[in-house]
Amino acid sequence: ACAKEVIESGKFSLLEEKQLQQDETWGYLCSENEYISSLYVYDMEEGRSDVFFGEESSMRCYISDARRSVVFGSPGVDIDWRNQNMFVLKTGETKYYVGKYQGVNRIPLLKLSEMYLIAAEASGDKSWLQTLRDHRGYVNYPLADDCDLTAEIEAEYRKEFIAEGQLFYYYKRLNYDKLPGMSEPMAKHYVFPMPDNELEFGNIK
């Protein structure tokens, strides 16, 4: 109910295809239209983006063509606006890196797209998911009437929250034993260890 209330408030709007023609980065366009709550980091590019997304850094967040094909699937790898606009390929390189935080100083905490995913999951109504997909390039690819809605929602989470950390909490909430593509059980990783200072000074046993 709360997700629908946010959507229907009219205060936020999903990206339109015409907005992609602007000379702006994907991160900037999303932050201006779809961010409900975010953190402003004044030195995002200088202090952080250069490390994880900069041209010369050895710690860049790379993603290979093969991995992109797995994440976006078919026909998404060819039509998905995120796949087309969110990654950067530098001259002479074969791997893309995430360009989501180029030209923007905001880290998303809550986005309108997540409201659509929550509404779809809570109601079981695939029209909420289809609306989000329409605003990501899938307007000519409607979901099948008999689609596995849970699987489709998970696939959308994997595409929508790249380099944001939100997917971890989706898996944690659903208590996935193992993450896709991984063999190690996740149970022990869902709860972070208590900080040493908390144990020492917090009277915690």
Residue spans for each PLM region:
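Acidic/Gly/His-enriched mid-domain segments of enzyme catalytic cores or analogous surface patches
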Residues: S64
